[in-house]
Amino acid sequence: MSVKASGGSSVARPQLYQTLAVATITQAEQQDRFLGRGELDELASYFASGAKRLEIAQLLTENSEIIVSRAANRIFVGGSPMAFLEKPREPELAMAAVGGGGDVRESMKLGTVTYVETRGGFLENLRSIFNTSPSGPTPPGFRPINIARYGPSNMAKSLRDLSWFLRYATYAIVAGDPNIIVVNTRGLREIIENACSGEATIVALQEIKAASLSYFRKDPEAAEIVSQYMDVLITEFKAPTPSNKLRQRPSGDQQGLQLPQIYFSAAERRPKFVMKTGLSATEKNEVIKAAYRQIFERDITRAYSLSISDLESKVKNGDISMKEFVRRLAKSPLYQKQFYQPFINSRVIELAFRHILGRGPSSREEVQKYFSIISNGGLPALVDALVDSAEYSDYFGEETVPYLRGLGQEAQECRNWGPQQDLFNYSAPFRKVPQFITTFAAYDRPLPDQHPYGSGNDPLEIQFGAIFPKETRNPSTSPAPFGKDTRRILIHQGPGINNQVSNPSARGLAPGSLGPKVFKLDQLPGTIGKKAAKGASVKFSESSTQAVIKATYLQVFGRDVYEGQRLKVQEIKLENGEISVRDFVRALAKSDLFRKLYWTPFYVCKAIEYIHRRLLGRPTYGRQENNKYFDIASKKGLYAVVDAILDSLEYTETFGEDTVPYERYLTPAGVALRQLRVGTIREDVANVEKQETPRFVELGTVKENRTQPDIDFRINQGVTKQREQTKVFKRVAGIKDKAAIKTLISAAYRQIFERDIAPYIAQNEFSGWESKLGNGEITVKEFIEGLGYSNLYLKEFYTPYPNTKVIELGTKHFLGRAPIDQAEIRKYNQILATQGIRAFINALVNSQEYNEVFGEDTVPYRRFPTLPAANFPNTQKLYNQLTKQNNDVVIPSFKPVQARIQSDKTPILAKAIADLAAQAKQMDKSKPLFIELGRSYNDGRGQSVEVGVGTTRRKPARIYRLTNGIGQAEKQLVINAIYRQVLDVFSGQVPDYYRRTELDSKLRNGEISVREFVREIASSEIYRKRFYTPYPNTKVIEFLFRHLLGRAPATQGEIRQYNKLLADNGLRAAVEAIVDSPEYSRYFGEDVVPYPRFPSLPAGNYLGSVQAAADLVKQSWSSLSPSTLTGRPGDR
């Protein structure tokens, strides 16, 4: 089976061992907490003994060969064991012959040579020679091993293993954790016993321990440390081989795997939290926090101060198990909001697997199974299926909090390796696209059309620059498992018969009109001192040479370069014929500009792909081609890659020496990218689409002439939106949600009493009925009947009204409609008169109509769709009339319905009325002409006063804008326009005492904007004297709107708002509010001078603005100025 898809290959970094510091910090990090007091003390003790541990390791390392030699001499006989130890250099050894006569070589052959330590003096040497007692209890069955029989190969392996044992001990001493010894020693006994003796190895390890301790006789602390780790070494070697961790699967579509125990021992310790009734309160809180971290991927209590206190108390008290606690957390509204509502069902399944089972989906069949469950039953059904599964019971049971079963915890599957590692990341909820089902489905599909090393290595096939997809946004890291012999599908830019795969001899042929334009240099004047290139011409044309140079720049760089970036020397050499086009391309590709643009910023794979497309005119075919260039780049760099492409046989056959490279092949994605762009569609070859009227337009077209009454009837038909917006409150059996019960009770109060009666609840009038309904002792129907029997209902809807009105209200409250006819009114009137209100309500609630429409558990509501047509207007009027609005009876009798077409709307009568109105508009020539001309009109036939007066105000005002780069004269025009607008200078000549020279200077220098200039002028002292002090606040507001917004106040609400602002905070605050308003920003922004906006104003505000503009400002020297200026108590 060939693999055609991959979910990505996340780099796996399995932990090979544990250290004290890393294990302690990792455990605190997994629990999202700070280090505890005990952990800090343990770390402090470890770091305090760091120098001692390094000293021990260094001393053991220096004497490692002597220690190993003692252990080897203890178990091997008949030769020199140390001769088989592979070591970098020969140590300095002191040897003494036991037999005394022969030389060293002969002694080694006879096995009469032993090694002694080189430190400790003469007494230590003697102790080493004559000490034949074992350093520990000799295991039964131990027999020394003869070197000659054991063989050189086995001896080398055994000496290597003894050296490794000592090395593992030194590693563990430095790390502060014996985990290194456990991982590398446990289970070796069975392996060693296949070629050697396990008892002999134990004796050798005991000798290693004794030899190591001999160096620390005067240091009890160091001796204790060495003894501790050596004991672990011996104990772990004696221990039996642990069994592998099996991962059994219930179905055949899932992989059954096993994990060696040493991988589990080396992995990071992942604490497992179990909820027991005997735990302390602190320990129970830790277990609950672990459940939150697993289900919500964060400690919601600490991060967001959220918790589900009801469930917490139940699981702490033992009312529910941890399994049930996990189930309810996964069904909570918080979980639905975080992990259900924002995602599609496939992604919800993946996240639920991670939270509840601690893994990702294993197969496509498993995803399909749970997809069917969530589609039919929603999130609750999915949660129930996962929590009730046999796998959950096997791994977690009733008391254990689920945990992530990732790398090191159990064997990982290969077919979902990448998605599962991504699913365990903290960023998993931020990925919306489902990964597992996408990967599983891709296994059955052909290879995708993408780069063999990932779709992110394909640049956009456009002219300008190297633009690669941004891999941090909607990442698509899934590589395509291309083989070394797989080629990508490329589309030839030219005739298909000239494809180089099927027709290699056609590489040099031009693509013609089906491909890009080809630039070929054929105007060289000659060559100097060398033979001319094949096909070179002696014709010379400066313009065509420059065209070739420009085309080369565009092809190599993707754009034209700046003048200072051009290679002038190479251009001159090309024009003089000293170099060919190929050499010119080579020089451009090796330039610093090309390196900075397309080599330095990118990964090597992306850079190779882009350079290959630019220089050879096509994308790379596959892994084999990419690997070749990648190897060259890693060994020799960019220049070697460029030379390899330009000196290739394909380049020579395609472009030769004098042709500028061009785009020969595109990927299908590149072709689609270019064809789907609107700008690339040629108008002369576009298909002429026939304009066809859609069928629904034809069916909706009016074919007859309709009268006005008919049109009005069609417009007004139907009912209001209230029919669609009706909400039905119904109690669901078996659910005791207090919030839902409370909402249902409130709906019942609003239906029966037509208001929310929260004040009456405080008097406990209905508390008994509410508690019974909440406990399920009564139904909603009985609750409604009880409300109708209450004293409050009798007081509000029975005592003040006659029987007919009581009947109307009763059918409205209990049946959701008005009485159908007079017969129904007579029926209920007789019940009211003979048996009273309770019998009347009982008859309504227990009627067949009530049981069919509302049943036992539904609150009555207004029944729009089921009412008879004749009764609909009565119900509409009854519901739209407020309670106690009047005492009128809505249905005194059923009047006949009036005709929908009024007599004056008939075509004949309407035409006659229109003719009479037209005659009335005609001028009466029997009267004098001046009477007709002086008549006023209110129907638009006469000339408006506005047309004749102030017509200049209706013209669009000139707009002044301060932009960058304008001259001083234009700036002065802008400044004058500001003064004329804000200070209302009629003549256009701004007096000098109005000007603020410091503001003028700042505006010219660009230190302030036009908006700031307007703000300061409107808040200045001259504005205050002209428009603020002499006038009342309402008039000041009118001035401010006209000067700063170019219009009059639109509504009384605006006037009241700014009137309060003026009275409380003064002129400055009002100016700030107007200048900083959204309306000012929308119309004028920062650099536009305010102007009168008369033509663009709404009709309702237009006349007010014209009137305000016509009101001249009364100057102090004018005869129209007020005789007494009403000042204000103080300027704010």
Swiss-Prot record:
Class of the enzyme per the UniProt entry, highest EC level: lyase
Q: Does the keyword Repeat apply?
A: yes
Alphabetical keyword list: Antenna complex, Bile pigment, Chromophore, Electron transport, Lyase, Membrane, Photosynthesis, Phycobilisome, Repeat, Thylakoid, Transport
**What GO biological process terms does the UniProt entry carry, in alphabetical order?**
photosynthesis
Q: Membrane topology type, per the record?
A: Peripheral membrane protein
Q: InterPro entries this protein is in?
A: Globin-like_sf, PBS_linker_dom, PBS_linker_sf, Phycobilisome_asu/bsu, Phycobilisome_asu/bsu_sf
| Keyword presence, Thylakoid | yes
Where does this protein hold (2R,3E)-phycocyanobilin? C196
Spell out the Gene3D superfamilies in the cross-references.
Phycobilisome linker domain (1.10.3130.20), Phycocyanins (1.10.490.20)
Q: Where in the cell is it found?
A: Cellular thylakoid membrane
Classification via SUPFAM superfamilies: Globin-like
**Maturation and modification:** Contains one covalently linked bilin chromophore. This protein autochromophorylates.
For this protein, the Enzyme Commission number is 4.-.-.-
| Any GO CC annotation of this UniProt entry | plasma membrane-derived thylakoid membrane
One molecular function GO term is:
lyase activity
Assembly and oligomerization: Heterodimer of ApcF (a variant beta-allophycocyanin). Phycobilisomes of this organism are composed of a two cylinder core, from which six rods radiate. The core is mainly composed of allophycocyanin alpha and beta chains and of minor components.
- Report the sequence similarity comment from the record: Belongs to the phycobilisome linker protein family.
User: What is the name of this protein?
Assistant: Phycobiliprotein ApcE
Organism, as annotated? Nostoc sp. (strain PCC 7120 / SAG 25.82 / UTEX 2576)
